[in-house]
């Protein structure tokens, strides 16, 4: 079993472009000893307007955000939840890199272990083609009040996590989790000056060992 606490995180944004789009909502649940110990949810002032598509998707309007605080102030209220934890999200690179981008703009280096439940679902349920949150909710009969709202989405992800642990041997799940976390260790060996030279665009990345043998091939909406 994992020894570290888990934080399930979900954000809603003004768009999908990291560095240009902004966060409009964040929700977090912290898990310790397989139980929720704390929850956090807040709207966020994106310092820009929300278009009709995003409002239609999330139900969040510009009026809703009028009195919201900007992300650095919101983060101060929930930063303690990240301490010593593993960041868990559905399509984790999206949520993680958005938060990292927001904090980088104020000079804060955000870096914690992360775990993607999309990748974990692919490993545990290879018989299925789609592993979107929508499909997972439908497949497992998970009850959700409001899709595309941050707290409802992470509660759905947490429900799936518990279902997966009932349907699979814990050692199998732990092995897949460890594999994900292990692949991230190579990133810590890359100097920040090298990372800053990478493009902030979608693409494919490959990690090689010292003999130039490919170790891992991945893709991201933001290579940096």
Tell me what each language-model feature is.
Residues 10-12, 95, 116, 153, ...:
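Acidic active-site catalytic centers that drive phospho-/nucleotidyl reactions
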Residues 152-223:
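GIY-YIG nuclease catalytic motif and its immediate N-terminal context
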Residues 8-9, 115, 215-217:
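Short hydrophobic beta-strand that contains or immediately precedes a catalytic carboxylate
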Residues 112-121:
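A short, structured active-site edge motif that brings together acidic residues
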Residues 13-15, 119, 156, 222:
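Short, glycine/acidic-enriched loop or turn micro-motifs at the edges of active sites
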Residues 1-112, 126-148:
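Conserved non-catalytic scaffold segment of RNase H-like nuclease domains
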């Amino acid at each position: 079993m994992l020894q570290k606490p888990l934080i399930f995180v979900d954000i809603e944004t003004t768009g999908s472009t990291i560095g240009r789009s902004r966060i409009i909502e964040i929700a977090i649940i912290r898990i310790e000893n397989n139980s929720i110990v704390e929850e956090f949810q807040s709207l966020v002032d994106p310092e820009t307007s929300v278009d009709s598509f995003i409002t239609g998707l999330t139900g969040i309007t510009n009026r809703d955000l009028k009195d919201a605080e900007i992300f650095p102030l919101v983060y101060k209220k929930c930063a303690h939840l990240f301490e010593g934890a593993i960041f868990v999200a559905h399509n984790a690179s999206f949520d993680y890199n958005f938060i990292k981008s927001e904090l980088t703009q104020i000079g804060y280096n955000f870096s914690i272990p992360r775990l993607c439940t999309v990748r974990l679902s692919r490993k545990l349920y290879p018989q299925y083609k789609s592993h979107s949150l929508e499909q997972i909710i439908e497949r497992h009969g998970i009850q959700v009040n409001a899709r595309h709202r941050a707290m409802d989405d992470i509660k759905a992800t947490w429900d799936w996590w518990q279902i997966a642990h009932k349907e699979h041997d814990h050692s199998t799940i732990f092995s897949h989790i460890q594999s994900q976390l292990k692949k991230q260790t190579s990133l810590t060996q890359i100097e920040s000056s090298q990372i800053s030279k990478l493009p902030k665009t979608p693409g494919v990345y490959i990690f090689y060992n010292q003999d130039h043998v490919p170790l891992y091939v991945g893709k991201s909406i933001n290579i940096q």
